[in-house]
């Protein structure tokens, strides 16, 4: 096996992609189940499939779980733990023969957002058989000390016709930092189960210490006294995410 892994590309093999294209042409109501351990580039065929299920490596009960999802016995609520790029070039350079590589901050959703590259499927993305709406993002305080915690609440409603679960995600963006920082980073999340039409208040908490960056000059963590934005949404690239500003003093 070549050093560094067993994949030459992030897309499926040409033979697999041709098979998917042929099956989708014969039956537009095709569901594609992908079993893999990391991101897969699907741009060549994703818009042809009726649905795509990312199975990962589900083990011996994976077939039963897959059947439960596609028959509606279970309403899916999983969220991606990584970014699925639209192009392999959007990710950091990868040398299969390297014995060491340094990514620094710039990988995953942090790199794509910095570069203005739209992902195929963002970090934290995942669909359901129902839909959820977000409203009324509120912060308990808009000024925090480094010893405090950011406390946020948001109203989440199941706007569909069946019960479902949503994973509410809170990202924080540092505004005007004196060091290079990611455009935003996930800092908290919460899972909520909702009946059709039900609305619940979801609470999210982030210790101000979690906003720190590591200062190599002092070998310590620093919470900058600057403005920040709390961003609450469905995934890292949610265009409808709610925002509220606060400041660390």
Describe every region a protein language model picked out:
Residues 1-249:
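C-terminal non-catalytic regions of proteins with extracellular/luminal or membrane-system context
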């Amino acid at each position: 096996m070549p050093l560094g892994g067993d994949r030459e590309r992030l897309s499926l093999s040409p033979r697999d992609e041709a098979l998917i294209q042929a099956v989708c042409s014969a039956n537009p109501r095709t569901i594609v189940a992908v079993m893999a351990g990391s991101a897969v580039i699907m741009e060549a065929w994703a818009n042809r499939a009726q649905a795509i299920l990312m199975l990962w490596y589900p083990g011996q009960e994976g077939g039963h779980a897959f059947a439960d999802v596609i028959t509606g016995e279970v309403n899916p609520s999983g969220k991606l733990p990584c970014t699925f790029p639209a192009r392999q070039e959007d990710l950091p350079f990868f040398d299969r023969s390297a014995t060491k590589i340094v990514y620094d901050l710039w990988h995953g959703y942090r790199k794509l957002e910095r570069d203005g590259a739209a992902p195929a499927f963002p970090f934290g993305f995942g669909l359901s058989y129902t839909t959820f709406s977000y409203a009324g993002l509120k912060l308990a305080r808009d000024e925090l000390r480094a010893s405090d915690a950011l406390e946020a609440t948001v109203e989440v409603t199941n706007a569909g016709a069946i019960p479902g679960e949503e994973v509410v995600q809170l990202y924080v963006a540092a505004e005007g930092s004196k060091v290079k920082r990611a455009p935003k980073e996930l800092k908290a999340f919460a899972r909520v189960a909702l009946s059709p039409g039900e609305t619940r208040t979801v609470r999210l908490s982030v210790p101000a210490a979690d906003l720190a960056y590591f200062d190599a000059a002092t070998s310590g963590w620093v919470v900058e006294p600057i403005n920040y934005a709390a961003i609450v949404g469905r995934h890292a690239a949610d265009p409808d995410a709610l925002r509220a500003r606060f400041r660390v003093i």
